[in-house]
Curated annotation (Swiss-Prot):
The keyword Ribonucleoprotein applies. Its main location: cytoplasm. This is Sm-like protein LSM6A. One of its GO terms (molecular function) is RNA binding. Expressed in roots, leaves, stems, flowers and siliques. Component of the heptameric LSM1-LSM7 complex that forms a seven-membered ring structure with a donut shape. The LSM subunits are arranged in the order LSM1, LSM2, LSM3, LSM6, LSM5, LSM7 and LSM4. Component of the heptameric LSM2-LSM8 complex that forms a seven-membered ring structure with a donut shape. The LSM subunits are arranged in the order LSM8, LSM2, LSM3, LSM6, LSM5, LSM7 and LSM4. LSM6A subunit interacts only with its two neighboring subunits, LSM3A or LSM3B and LSM5. The gene is LSM6A.
Length: 91
């Protein structure tokens, strides 16, 4: 088993499986520049190009802009993380 696979309840989960499972969910996309984009992941391709909806841009932890749709080129992406929603956030 390679270092990028994870055993979850008896099945092997790859990064591709994770990315498929988060489509339509709230995510944080961190860029190499340190800027964060938070919104709903709508599309992701093989080059890690990302389309998001209801996107907010954070610089140094502070909200700078809000966008309806955002398109991020994959070579700028450091990581993609899911957002844990709380009751106060509307989950």
């Amino acid at each position: 088993m390679s270092g990028v696979e994870e055993k979850v309840s008896g099945t092997t989960k790859t990064p591709a499986d994770f990315l498929k499972s988060i489509r339509g969910r709230p995510v944080v996309v961190k860029l190499n520049s340190g800027v964060d984009y938070r919104g709903t992941l709508t599309c992701l391709d093989g080059y890690m190009n990302i389309a998001m909806e209801q996107t907010e841009e954070y610089v140094n932890g502070q909200l700078k802009n809000k966008y309806g749709d955002a398109f991020i080129r994959g070579n700028n992406v450091l990581y993609i993380s899911t957002v844990n929603m709380t009751v106060a956030d509307g989950a």
